[in-house]
UniProtKB/Swiss-Prot annotation:
Listed Pfam families: CTP_synth_N, GATase
Taxonomic lineage from the root: Bacteria, Pseudomonadati, Chlorobiota, Chlorobiia, Chlorobiales
Amidoligase domain: annotated span: 1-272
Residue positions binding Mg(2+): 76, 146
Quaternary assembly: Homotetramer.
The name this protein goes by in its record: CTP synthase
Top EC group: ligase
Record-linked CDD domains: CTPS_N (cd03113), GATase1_CTP_Synthase (cd01746)
Length: 569
């Protein structure tokens, strides 16, 4: 295959409604192109004025995805990494806030030589420079850029104008726009309606952009007649109208797009020839394992503070999909509201009936903390597999201090600055930090693992690198006491000072980690801790089933005489 001389650009936009899945579309297309032997990267442009999503509420933004180099980014970058098996970075997520900040800083430095600084040309030029810089500094064939928001949003206009100008600058065959729209199915009329898509394209034309390809989300498959109609009214060949109906799992999307020949249309429009056929055997096998698990199903409870909005735990949910497939089981998830467990009359046995493991999720602040601690206590005492991530690990050490080490006033200084026993305390280098945004311990750090621990059994190695996002750490003043009472500190920083992994020795599977393993789980590289946790939950479920079967068996066997008849007859 002849490599393109210049980096080719694909811009993905969305219309009609939000949350259509531009991130999944971008990731799926990137995976298909990579499987053909092309070098592909994906980036996300977000129109909000925040510099990054690090200080945004999970209820508004969902999960904050952390990269190896410490960027706090949009959750769509998680999809990019999981689908492409490629790491993203600081440059993979650009917000309008970062653009404006850069422009204002340049104005203060006198870089514009006294000019009146305006959206056109200064803001637009700043965006175009970022676009060109990402392509120039990468060893790429294709750069996919997802533009957040929906066509018609005021805040997206600078990104769209920059895309329009860049397409003119680069010339034909170097940049295409894929527009994702929605074709609603009206049940009363038993009909798919194309008018919203037509209006969305009209708005895109209004800012000077003719989409090159339309991808139409719908509940039902698009017929050839519908594609012809959409193409006719949107200035497109019907072959450039791609149908994308609902599917059982997001991991089927690449296979559906392959069937619709989206990748072939993209390569033709970009003038790329001689590419190989996509190798997707592993991907098909993975999808079959997700849809048709061979060893049944299990249920894992996720105890968290933001359970009303599952996107706050997006990477955890996807890691369970990967670990379920690697264990040949379906992992069902039940979201457990931490605050509910703080009620004195809360019935844990009833709430956790049918649950085979408990994960206590990350978070910030004191809301729901006592509920999390009670869930952890129940998991420890009932020998239920437990996994604590970041705040979940910190809560596990507080619970252990209170109920095993008899330190009844144990707490974290995040929740009680005057805690008598500060099991969790602010990291030393954080004590002088005043700003909130981008100031935590962020990114990938090494961790040394203890031989013979559950962590070592999972990883099968002594040195790992994991991603972090925290300000607080375990207080080493209590380390000796905890070890005497049965806790194993199985993972630490290389200097041994920062506790990364804790375990309870006499428990079937009780592990807490300071880092975020969910951020490194991928389709082709399930995270070892999630695989091990799901395996423990599967074993626990089998034990419960065997106990249930034993209970259902008769409690006595009749005594038979020599003729084989019951003596009681």
């Amino acid at each position: 295959m002849a490599r393109p001389k210049n980096v080719k650009h694909i811009f993905v936009t969305g219309g009609v409604i939000s949350s259509l899945g531009k991130g999944i579309l971008s990731a799926s297309l990137g995976m298909l192109l990579k499987s053909r032997g092309l070098r592909v990267a994906i980036q996300k442009y977000d129109p909000y004025i925040n510099v990054d999503p690090g200080t945004m509420s999970p209820y508004q933004h969902g999960e904050v995805y952390v990269t190896d180099d410490g960027a706090e980014t949009d959750l769509d970058l998680g999809h990019y990494e999981r689908f492409l098996d490629e790491s993203t970075s600081q440059t993979s997520n650009l917000t309008m806030g970062r653009v404006y900040k850069s422009v204002i800083d340049k104005e203060r430095n006198g870089d514009y030589l006294g000019a009146t600084v305006q959206v056109v040309p200064h803001v637009i030029d700043e965006i175009k420079e970022r676009m060109a810089e990402q392509a120039k500094n990468s060893n790429l064939d294709i750069l996919i850029t997802e533009i957040g928001g929906t066509i018609g949003d005021i805040e997206s206009l600078p990104f769209l104008e920059a895309m329009r100008e860049l397409k003119l600058d680069m010339g034909d065959g170097n940049l295409i726009n894929i527009h994702l729209t929605y074709v609603p199915y009206i049940k009363a009329a038993s009909e798919l309606k194309t008018k919203p898509t037509q209006h969305s394209v009209k708005m895109l034309l209004g800012v000077g952009i003719q989409p090159d390809i339309l991808v139409c989300r719908s509940e039902k498959q698009l017929s050839r007649d519908i594609k012809n109609k959409v193409g006719h009214f949107c200035n497109l060949n019907d072959l450039d109208v791609i149908g994308l109906s609902d599917c059982a799992t997001i991991y089927e999307v690449p296979l559906m797009l392959l069937q619709e020949e989206l990748d072939s249309r993209v390569l033709k429009k970009l003038g790329i020839k001689g590419y190989q056929e996509p190798a997707l055997t592993y991907w098909r096998d993975f999808c079959n394992k997700v849809k048709f698990p061979q060893e049944g199903e299990i249920t894992i409870g996720i105890c968290g503070k933001y359970t009303e909005y599952p996107d706050a735990y997006k990477s955890i949910l996807e890691a369970f999909v990967h670990a379920g497939a690697s264990n040949n089981v379906r992992v069902n998830v039940k979201l457990l509201r931490a605050e509910s467990a703080e009620e004195p009359t809360f019935d844990f046995a009833k709430e956790l009936a049918g649950i085979h493991a408990i994960l206590v999720a990350p978070g910030f602040g004191d809301r729901g903390i006592e509920g999390k601690i009670r869930y952890i206590q129940y998991a420890r005492e009932q020998n239920i597999p437990f996994f604590g991530i970041c705040l979940g690990m910190q809560c596990a050490t507080i619970e252990f201090a209170r109920n095993v080490c008899d330190l009844q006033d144990a707490n974290s200084t995040e929740f009680n600055k005057r805690a008598r026993f500060a099991i969790i305390d602010l990291m030393e280098h954080q004590k002088k930090v005043k700003e909130k945004g981008g100031t935590m311990r962020l990114g990938s750090y090494p961790c040394i693992i203890t031989d013979g621990s559950k962590a070592h059994m999972a990883y099968q190695k002594f040195l790992v690198n994991e991603r972090h996002r925290h300000r607080y750490e375990f207080n080493n003043s209590f380390r000796t006491l905890f070890e005497e009472r049965g806790m194993l500190f199985s993972g630490t920083s290389p200097n041994g000072e920062l506790i990364e992994i804790v375990e309870i020795k006499n428990h079937r599977w009780f592990v807490g980690v300071q880092f975020h393993p969910e951020l490194k789980s991928r389709v082709q590289k399930v995270h070892p801790l999630f695989h091990s946790f799901v395996a423990a939950a599967k074993d626990y479920a089998r034990g419960v089933q065997q106990m249930d079967m034993a209970i259902e068996m008769p409690s006595f066997m009749p005594i038979l005489n020599e003729e084989g008849e019951s003596k009681s007859e």
